[in-house]
């Protein structure tokens, strides 16, 4: 059974070029593996009233059902009518806010987190372009976590009441929403398994392998990763201390499985990474 860790990475669609998305269009080299020095201020996210056409979006097959007729696509286009820009380190929504919409990520990456009893932010997931955030708000009409942009991002706003109405008329859309919700349940079960049974090496290997899997689904490189989360955030998600994450990255590099240059990771020996998992084919 396959499940997904919501690790997050963005690279430009290219067969061999390494790209630093902190500066779009710029090829990554030794001097620009760093993240962009974008503003860290928590300025509010900016609504952006640009008409969005799902029918023309390159990510359509990732966040929308396939096989829709032109009429069905036009009806969805009419519902998903605006984009919203979110600055780096700014929240798309916060825990406790009223739930209004789901958000399909067009560009950028997000982390979801909850406030732990000791005041720390506990990372519960990472989301990338083509994925949907906001599902947590459906059950009680309010969000139960924060969704924070790890880089400047843009989302499509999907008003839930209108999506719900349309899904009752367009069977493929309803089925797709059910699949998205089911996938989130499976993901949460997978994370529980990871935290409860896997050693540190297995957790990090599963995390990196998941990034590769998600990149391939988008036609990106299967080996060049630019991580958008910090190692501390990775540790929070995987239930590991920062020192353990850093030590495990170093071990993987020393053993020739990966090459690491700050946030740039190159998978050198994917089969050895897979071999670290105690149960081949287990959740990753």
Tell me what each language-model feature is.
Residues 32, 213-284:
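Phosphate-/nucleic-acid-contacting segments
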Residues 32-88, 132-133, 137-139:
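Cyclic nucleotide-binding regulatory module and flanking cytosolic helices
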Residues 89, 100-113, 129-130:
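Glycine- and acidic-residue-biased ligand/ion/polar-headgroup-sensing regions
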Residues 91-97:
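Short phosphate-coordinating micro-motif centered on Lys-Gly-acidic
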Residues 123-190:
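Cyclic-nucleotide recognition modules
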Residues 168-241:
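Polybasic "coupling" helices that flank or enter modular domains
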């Amino acid at each position: 059974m396959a499940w997904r860790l919501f690790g997050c990475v963005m690279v430009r669609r290219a067969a061999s070029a390494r790209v630093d998305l902190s500066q779009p269009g710029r090829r990554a080299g030794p001097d620009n593996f760093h993240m962009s020095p974008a503003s860290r201020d928590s300025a509010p996210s900016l609504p952006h009233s640009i008409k969005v056409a799902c029918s023309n979006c390159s990510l359509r097959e990732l966040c929308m059902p396939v096989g829709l007729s032109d009429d069905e696509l036009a009806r969805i286009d009419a519902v998903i009518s605006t984009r919203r820009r979110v600055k780096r380190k700014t929240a798309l929504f916060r825990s406790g806010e009223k739930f209004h919409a789901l958000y399909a990520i067009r560009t950028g990456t997000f982390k979801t987190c909850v406030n732990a009893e000791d005041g720390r932010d506990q990372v519960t997931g990472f989301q990338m372009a083509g994925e949907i955030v906001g599902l947590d708000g459906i059950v009680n009409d309010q969000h139960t976590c924060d969704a924070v942009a790890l880089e400047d991002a843009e989302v499509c706003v999907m008003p839930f009441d209108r999506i719900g109405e349309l899904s009752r008329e367009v069977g493929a859309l309803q089925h797709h929403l059910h699949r998205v919700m089911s996938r989130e349940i499976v993901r949460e079960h997978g994370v529980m398994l990871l935290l409860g049974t896997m050693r540190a090496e297995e957790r990090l290997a599963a995390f990196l392998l998941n990034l590769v899997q998600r990149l391939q689904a988008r036609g990106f490189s299967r080996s060049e990763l630019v991580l958008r989360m910090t190692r501390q955030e990775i540790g929070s998600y995987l239930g590991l201390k920062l020192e353990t994450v850093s030590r495990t990255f170093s071990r993987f590099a020393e053993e020739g499985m990966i090459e690491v240059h700050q946030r740039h990771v190159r998978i050198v020996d994917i089969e050895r990474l897979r071999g670290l998992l105690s149960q081949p084919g287990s959740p990753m």
